[in-house]
Amino acid sequence: ISQVKQIYWQDALNFLTKLTPRRAWNAAKVLASFYLTRWMKRPIQWGLPLTISFEPTTACNLRCPECPSGLRAFSRPTGNLRADFFRQTMDDLHKDLLCLIFYFQGEPYINPNFLDMVRHAHERGIYTITSTNGHFLSEANARKTIESGLDRLIISVDGTTQDTYESY
């Protein structure tokens, strides 16, 4: 358990290294607007988002029974996130943005530009997180992931056997 605590502490310290004075000021504005909104009972919005989420792709190599991606049941446009759109958005927001979540329902590693996007965010000092089913984590891809600067990698295991996987 002490090793797990150490990993969490290292991750928390890494996250805090992303906090610049400008990002701290932005966070203070967002927090103040939240409390003023509650107190005044009317919406007040100061600051820019602290965290955003990008879905690198809606595609997935699995067919999880509860997932719109796995079921191919999206009611919205599908495909890969365009790298140019991503870069422009990061260039517009990076000075105030603290954290970028790189997943939703697709498998991020399917997008061929995924690790380049992670690197782009990392170079701008943004804390990056992704979740994967792990199928694309070969030794070479794992090395590229580390080199990209990804801060947190979540590997989702949705069942240890086919029966438990299919049970939900």
Where are these regions (language model features)?
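Conserved alpha-helical substructure of the radical SAM core
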Residues: 4-152, 163, 167
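Conserved phosphate-donor/acceptor-positioning beta-strand/loop module used by diverse small-molecule
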Residues: 155-157
